[in-house]
Amino acid sequence: MSDYKDTLNLPKTSFSMKGNLANKEPMILNKWEKQGIYKKIREHFAGREKFVLHDGPPYANGSIHVGHAVNKILKDIIIKSKTLSGYDAPFTPTWDCHGLPIELQVEKKHGKAGQSISEDDFRKECRKYAKKQVEIQKKDFKRLGVLGDWEQPYLTINFDYEANMIRTLAKIIENGHLSKGFKPVHWCTDCGSALAEAEVEYADKVSPAIDVKFKIKDKDKLAQAFGLDSLNHDAFAIIWTTTPWTLPANQAIAVNNQLNYSLIKIEDFYIILAENLVEQTLKRYAIENAQIIATTTGNKLTGIIAEHPFYSRHVPILHGDHVTDDSGTGLVHTAPTHGVDDFTLGKEHNLSMEIFVKGNGCYSENTKLFAGEFIFKANDRIIELLGEKKRLMNSDKIKHSYPHCWRHKTPLMFRATPQWFISMEKQGLRDKALQAIKETSWAPSWGQARIEGMVKDRPDWCISRQRTWGVPLPLFIHKETEELHPNTIEILHKVAEKIEKDGIEAWFNADDCEFITETAQYKSVKDTLDVWFDSGSSSMCILDLDKRLSYPADLYLEGSDQHRGWFQTSLLVAMSAKGSQPYKEVFTHGFVVDEHGRKMSKSLGNVTSPQDIYNTLGADILRLWTASTDYKSEMAVSDQILKRTADTYRRLRNTARFLLSNLDGFNPVTDIIEFDKLVKLDQWAIAKTKEFQDKIIEAYDKYQTHTVAQLIHHFCSIEMGSFYLDIIKDRQYTAKTDGHPRKSAQTAIYHIVHALVRWMAPILSFTANEIWDATPKTTDLPIQLCEWYTGLKSFDQDAELDLEYWAKIQEIRSEVNRVLEIKRNEDVIKASLEAEITIYADKYNYKLLEKLGNELRFLLISSKADLKVIEESTSSSIAANIPGLLIEITKIEEPKCERCWHRSSTVGDNPQYKDICSRCVENITTEAGESREFA
């Protein structure tokens, strides 16, 4: 037996079978750094149509988590796909660097500002800490393969950014959107500051739920309201509340003029309840012997005076539109300094706005009985006092959704304080914002309704904070009238100039006289700006000013929580400062959860860190998982899910390796064969690749990365692995090295690789780089500078063997494979090359298959394939799952060719080559080798 190994075209490539990504990727990153790849991309695509994806700034505090990784990877995929489409698509990373979380970290080390450390030094430490965190996060983002202008990121602590925030504020004031107000705002006692809507989280909380008796002072007036002559017992208005601590601030009881109210006799006193709530309220009190005396409307009750349950204070009953009979008692306890509706009612009726609670959550000195106590701890004492005063009708507990601080996770309170607001009503900002939302494209589509609902219902935006580490609110107000200085706009521009030179310290360390001369009449505001104003200003501070970018951005892409966060604050800043929305399109992705749909937490032990993933599996696995997951809903990740992703990656890598290994010796300059002269199956492969490329580009354009990933996987595993590559192995390995059949397949493979590597590049950035390095090509450009491959061709409309024809052949082949498997299991054959396949076909299928002539066997990977009319079928034939088709498999008895392994009667016909078939002899001995037309 001879050794024919040297006569075969064995696969050969520098592209390794094993990814070894965790070790290779850092080396590839290093190469990109040395090449200055991002700069080269910018230079190469300069002058092209721009596509700007504006990066929402992550907070510079702590290592990135998998949610951060998902966000940056999705952005990177989109940017790279747009670059492939020929756009100049820059990516400038941003970071949010002011605010409470950084303050807290610095406090842990240095103590509170103004106590253990000066405020000036505290700010310096905050800036130092933020910069350090940026470098940590930057390193992680770069390790993920994310390309961007990492050397010139936008940080909200950059002096020019801080200055441009002040200039943005000046525009907002100039446009008439700023107002000062004494209003209830969400207040965190731990922060010692007001919070914006976006900083409020809702979580379940168990609270006391009490019904309190307010004694009616004028019984005769109450009797008259109910149409009675008189009342012979005391009467009480009953309110229900889950915040007993607000009772010291009670100034009124609210009813609704349109609701009906009942007077109910219980033993020796009367109570007032909304008519529709009587039954459920009495049931809650476990009272069965109550008697409804009379009913009246709310408007008859207004003006009646009650007595505070534990203070010597008169409490009027007033009408409030916000009062309903859905729950509680239908009478609402009103503390104007601790609720929005309460405050509105208080202003309308000139109720006392006395402050009873300080910023630290303790009652002020003027709070009788409870001065100095922490409000939430005082609940029990207040309930106890109500009991002693016989003013407690009922006491219970309730579990309900309650606002908490996004950072401290502690319950918030509503507290009226003097603050600065961007008014939603002045200059029609709310209506303008709602119109801008309609003019923006939202995906998923429900995002539009979500943000519309939030903007419709949101209060004025409180932009002032009582913090140390933040951009100042550098205003001057009159010491008596508290009106803004008449030259506020000019002053703000002067402040901005100084900050641009020396940072925010230029304001905090300056004397008022550096900015104004009327220091006797005006004082400076000591507040800082809400950190959401920092990030919300990015469209004005970056897009509107950086000539490398453009306003509005083409795309904002963030997590779905940003409808109430950055999407909204960006919109409000842009609309109030510039009068137009900052984005054309807004996409959101879901949160990352574990495989059971649970939020990730250290306590559950289900945290998957991006660092662990890229240090073990490689960043490309994380990128592939991100792209493969439909990010419009929650994104599940776990070790098991990543293992499945790694399996998918291996299939893709193996496909790429097979393709590359069969391009050994191929010169694209001299060896390319024209489409019309290719073997028909190779024509199909190119046309099929073109069909997939069109779908893939469309999916990329719609940001449907999971569709892209599915298409690439299907292409590699089904169209290539299970069909085309399976069939051409024989031709590639055994045909004449320089013969037409092999060069035809290599031409197709060349086109396929050039398309496939580009499809992969936005997602599998490191692997695509490897593939590109191992690919024969006619360009020196790195893959990052390439555009979509244009060397593919579709079939002409009149092509006889078009995609539809080959799809039918694939169906028939699948049925043959099914029957082959049956015969393998029956031990009739061990491999398909041992099989003689006979297909019995009706007229339609016969006509399809006869076009392939004697090359049908190559498509079926058998040594012999016969086509016969269905009427000749035998009892041993098996019906296919295709009408008009039967298949018969028998074992072929002819000898095996030691070179191609086909069974052939021609083995030994040539005395010089006794153990190979005539086809192999032809491929070894003749100049042209065998010929192929179809497969």
From Swiss-Prot:
UniProt key word Ribonucleoprotein: no
Ligand binding (L-isoleucyl-5'-AMP): E558
Known catalytic reactions: tRNA(Ile) + L-isoleucine + ATP = L-isoleucyl-tRNA(Ile) + AMP + diphosphate
Molecular function (Gene Ontology), one example: isoleucine-tRNA ligase activity
Cofactor: Zn(2+)
Enzyme class, broadest EC rank: ligase
Entry text on domains: IleRS has two distinct active sites: one for aminoacylation and one for editing. The misactivated valine is translocated from the active site to the editing site, which sterically excludes the correctly activated isoleucine. The single editing site contains two valyl binding pockets, one specific for each substrate (Val-AMP or Val-tRNA(Ile)).
SUBUNIT field: Monomer.
Record's subcellular location: Cytoplasm
Sequence similarity: Belongs to the class-I aminoacyl-tRNA synthetase family. IleS type 1 subfamily.
Coiled-coil regions listed in the entry: none
Residue interval(s) of motif 'KMSKS' region: 599-603
Listed EC numbers: 6.1.1.5
Gene Ontology BP, a term: isoleucyl-tRNA aminoacylation
Membrane-spanning residues: none
Cofactor details (free text): Binds 1 zinc ion per subunit.
Protein name (Swiss-Prot/TrEMBL): Isoleucine--tRNA ligase
Lineage: Bacteria, Pseudomonadati, Pseudomonadota, Gammaproteobacteria, Thiotrichales
GO cellular component, one term: cytosol
Function, as annotated: Catalyzes the attachment of isoleucine to tRNA(Ile). As IleRS can inadvertently accommodate and process structurally similar amino acids such as valine, to avoid such errors it has two additional distinct tRNA(Ile)-dependent editing activities. One activity is designated as 'pretransfer' editing and involves the hydrolysis of activated Val-AMP. The other activity is designated 'posttransfer' editing and involves deacylation of mischarged Val-tRNA(Ile).
Record-listed Zn(2+) binding positions: C897, C900, C917, C920
Record-listed ATP binding positions: K602
